[in-house]
């Protein structure tokens, strides 16, 4: 099972995630989010030996200037979490970037929207609301396409990740459930370790 952890702090969380072998490390560029990182924050990213981990810039309707000056210099992937059209995704793809396109699923009718974004390298099925920890409905998970190109987000943690595997999910995106109880946006390193331990256990 592949894992992406989103909403990381560039100086506090990255080395741990690399050491644990987390596949994708997500950094949020969204000023309304308590997980938002600044341009100054990400300067430290160039100092890490990423090994097999990929760095992801999580964005909402990004402009070309931001993509050219920030994403292309520091990140392996860009995650598009806004209202980007098929044409816009193709434009960004033409800039030489690997793309994760988030699809917000409210009901079964939303699932086929992913077919519009053939240029995306990864499709992330998520619940509505970028900053809301809402569990993905189990009745819809069984209807999602499966495989390494398709990831699932939505209140996933060490407590339900085994159920995700049983439902055929092979790529999970974790975020808010890895945070401390005291501070939103602040990752709990013990929760990260326990979650990755659980993933590794499921591989055996």
Regions flagged by a language model, labelled:
Residues 1-204:
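Conserved N-terminal beta1-alpha1 strand-loop-helix module at the mouth
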């Amino acid at each position: 099972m592949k894992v992406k952890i989103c909403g990381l702090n560039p100086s506090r969380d990255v080395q741990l995630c690399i050491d644990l072998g987390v596949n994708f490390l997500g950094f949020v560029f969204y000023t309304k989010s308590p997980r938002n990182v600044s341009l100054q924050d990400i300067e430290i990213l160039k100092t890490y030996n990423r090994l097999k981990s990929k760095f992801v810039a999580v964005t909402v309707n990004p402009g070309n200037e931001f993509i050219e000056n920030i994403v292309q210099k520091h990140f392996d992937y860009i995650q598009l979490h806004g209202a980007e059209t098929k044409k816009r995704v193709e434009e960004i793809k033409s800039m030489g970037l690997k793309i994760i396109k988030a699809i917000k699923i409210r009901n079964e009718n939303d699932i086929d929207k992913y077919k519009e974004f053939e240029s995306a390298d990864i499709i992330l099925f998520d619940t509505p609301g970028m900053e809301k920890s809402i569990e993905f409905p189990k009745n819809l998970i069984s209807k999602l396409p499966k495989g390494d190109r398709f990831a699932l987000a939505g209140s996933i943690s060490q407590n339900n990740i085994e159920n995700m595997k049983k439902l055929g999910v092979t790529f999970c995106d974790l975020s808010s459930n890895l945070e401390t109880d005291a501070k939103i946006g602040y990752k709990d390193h013990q929760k990260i370790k326990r979650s990755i331990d659980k993933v590794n256990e499921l591989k055996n």
